[in-house]
Amino acid sequence: MKKYENTGSKDTRSGFGAGMTELGQKNENVVALCADLIGSLKFDDFKKNHPERFFQIGIAEANMIGIAAGLTIGGKIPFTGTFANFSTGRVYDQIRQSVAYSDKNVKICASHAGLTLGEDGATHQILEDIGLMKMLPGMTVINTCDYNQTKAATIAIADHHGPVYLRFGRPVVPNFMPSDEPFVIGKAILLNEGTDVTIVATGHLVWEALLAAEALEARGISAEVINIHTIKPLDDEAILKSVGKTGCVVTAEEHNILGGLGESVARVLALNTPKPQEFVAVNDSFGESGTPEQLMEKYKLNNQAIVEAVERVIKRK
């Protein structure tokens, strides 16, 4: 298969900003709402080019969600933007009541997700947001892996009717997905074919999964790597097809072990074809302050942790 290479590291939030810039030019119904974080969400170009479609709500996230829900009634497609912690935990009641329950066409765009927010620490990091959002009926949940995929996802969700949670991050990470790769909601992407183990990864852990596959190949272990950008609806077919071939799976995510991708995959397997599974995720704890690199190592969210999980799960086949 094609070998994926880092074409130049970028932050995924800049991919979101680039997607918003393109949407601003293409779709006059797209509007942006920001909770006092224009630079952090990379809304600068959209605000400059379309000031009449940009709304600075301030540090009033609950109001932002309510306003966004109202704008959909007039045919607008609102994209809200703030940190992932404030996009979910702080406004969960408003999302449930005003957006999800009434199936409003709001795009909840959440930057600085996971541990890799870094030095701001546990009060600003969030590791439970995927679980919160995937439990809401009708909510589509997307977690992108690099700049190119985040840009493509941002553009794609504008054409999807219904509430969407789009999750991306702050740090600079490898950019390896092709810029012309189609983004299809709910369809996994097979990155590397293998026969011994399936690695199902999402977000920043996708690149780490590819690095792990290289290391495993040197040890004589053939790893299949699947990029799951859409947590809900999950591509059950792709997972079952791969695990049916390899006989075991490792899930990898920058999220709590409870409520995330790993649990969704476990449910699919339990209902269809139970197989050994190992989880690479945060073991039910809050984060802390540190550089992204320090935190990913401490909480075992890197390629070495994936390799170790693969070695464990293969022994259980």
Model-derived segments and spans:
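Thiamine diphosphate
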Residues: M1-R167, V172, P182, ...
